[in-house]
Amino acid sequence: MSHQGKKSIPHITSDRLLIRGGRIINDDQSFYADVYLEDGLIKQIGENLIVPGGVKTIEANGRMVIPGGIDVNTYLQKPSQGMTSADDFFQGTKAALAGGTTMIIDHVVPEPGSSLLTSFEKWHEAADTKSCCDYSLHVDITSWYDGVREELEVLVQDKGVNSFQVYMAYKDLYQMSDSQLYEAFTFLKGLGAVILVHAENGDLIAQEQKRILEMGITGPEGHALSRPEELEAEAVFRAIAIAGRINCPVYITKVMSKSAADIIALARKKGPLVFGEPIAASLGTDGTHYWSKNWAKAAAFVTSPPLSPDPTTPDYLTSLLACGDLQVTGSGHCPYSTAQKAVGKDNFTLIPEGVNGIEERMTVVWDKAVATGKMDENQFVAVTSTNAAKIFNLYPRKGRIAVGSDADVVIWDPDKMKTITAKSHKSTVEYNIFEGMECHGSPLVVISQGKIVFEDGNISVSKGMGRFIPRKPFPEHLYQRVRIRSKVFGLHSVSRGMYDGPVYEVPATPKHAAPAPSAKSSPSKHQPPPIRNLHQSNFSLSGAQIDDNNPRRTGHRIVAPPGGRSNITSLG
């Protein structure tokens, strides 16, 4: 199949489908009903539906009917050192559908200094010709340059982009200073955008990387050692603090550690509009693998922020996800082949970062959260689909089983056992970080745009059948609260009378005083310290004085100062 320029192929005609005998699960309710799909939309929900003849019927047999998953954190063609991640939009979205995800939001990652608009069009074209499922695009702001504001305005107003990621890490590449973050947050709030933050302290990471390499540590364990969770937590705190001063919502991507999650949870209790997104990897595995004797296995887990070496972290993050302190699960899907990872075989800083998870995400969440009793089925729908749809202004078109919503539907079997393995996954990489994990919960049937794309373990898709889904700015789930808070908590000056008292006249000083020569450059000339030395003075008495005829007193030794004798070594 050939593609010239923009996608010219017709979308596959949607089937008329009737899902009968299922239990519909939304984020806020569960009930038994039939669902009729036509023209890519949910047309009817209820019992004893009247439908046209020739409709294909799917017997759900009491199983769960849930909204298709939405993965808002993928990197399907991320550049790294002249390479791109192993899964393109065809292979990546094919894997997503096999796991029950029917929409992704991928990251556009421009080269620093390059045009955001040009990069967006490049990603858009690649996704439009290859994607198997619906998609949208974040645009990462990799540098804050002249003209970036105009491009951001065009992306929001004309291109259907309402979310942008900024970086606090990757010094001398993507990293922004605090003042740039403040400037970017302020401008993006005015556009009604969702601000995503990669939160790590890039300055300290750069110092730690240098120190650890100098110690002779070059393997994947150096990646974790140079990025301790304190550096993630500090950056999360700083991002929330900056956003709080501006009263703008902030979304922390890839929450990987207990410390970072705790800061988000505490901040939400105090009021800031902050959202946290753990990924499948941080919920399903840990960073102990960085110390594996098998270099290729250890390198497979390299991602940033790194997975926590604390093996209790996944369970802890799952608990916070279940209680609402964290709200969305992504995958951070950005796998590189073992050969690509091996570019950093002698230097951990050169290992391209990224893990798999686009296919495993929903199964991992079900197994770790619902099958353990931490989370109910409605919360599962919320953290895998609905919350993302609300935050990124896709709701209720996506993220809900309702009349008028897109016909992106999954029949989910909570009891089906699945063993995750690279031998059967849809990704092109030869490893899987969840290798051998036995999980409860898996999709039986996946429907995208009203068409069955996955059934009985078989996937049926074609390149380019996915659609670009534009997103409008100012999502109500976020900005309704922003508007109210601006009115209620706006800054106001104090009404007071004018001060009419004396004003001290400060002598004018030059803005840039010439520095005094250092002792090293003028060793023969003593330089007085910058503060007044009471033992040095050019004051002298000369000439006749009024008391010259008075007899002089001899010196007296003061035995005890006023207030009595003191001893600095005694507190008594």
From Swiss-Prot:
Homotetramer, and heterotetramer with DPYSL2, DPYSL3, DPYSL4 or DPYSL5. Interacts with PLXNA1. Interacts with FLNA (via calponin-homology (CH) domain 1 and filamin repeat 24); the interaction alters FLNA ternary structure and thus promotes FLNA dissociation from F-actin. Keywords: Cell projection, Cytoplasm, Cytoskeleton, Nitration, Phosphoprotein. The modification Phosphothreonine is found at residues 101-102, 509. The modification Phosphoserine is found at residues 8, 521-522, 537, 540, 542. GO terms for biological process: negative regulation of neuron projection development; regulation of postsynapse assembly; semaphorin-plexin signaling pathway. Residues 509-572 are annotated as: Disordered. Residues 534-543 have a biased composition (Polar residues). InterPro entries: Amidohydro-rel (IPR006680), Hydantoinase/dihydroPyrase (IPR011778), Metal-dep_hydrolase_composite (IPR011059), Metal_Hydrolase (IPR032466), Metallo-dep_Hydrolases_sf (IPR050378). CDD domains: D-HYD. Its main location: cytoplasm. GO terms for cellular component: actin cytoskeleton; centrosome; cytosol; dendrite; growth cone; midbody; neuronal cell body; perikaryon. It comes from the Eukaryota. Coiled coil: none annotated. It comes from Mus musculus (Mouse). This is Dihydropyrimidinase-related protein 1.
